């Protein structure tokens, strides 16, 4: 989702996959919730698909709940497709020294999973 925030990082608008984005602040899909608030929304929206970007977050914002962002300014790559997964791996190879990763360190483990 794409969002707009105020000066205190409180989300004012959240739109999932907009045709014409109003900002370049994108959700990484990682959320932290107060348990009671989340359970309340899951119960309220139980007959929907319960997609966080389409239902839960926009509903909370619409009801003036306090929803904030944490701006992450390092490398992040959506790896939801084979092409983007390949691109992320190529980025790792190209930028390993830049980010302080030694790919030739025998003690550094790389974990991956398919399916």
Predicted ranges, named:
Residues 1-36, 43-45:
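Conserved core of the sugar-phosphate nucleotidyltransferase
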Residues 36-37, 43-115:
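Left-handed beta-helix
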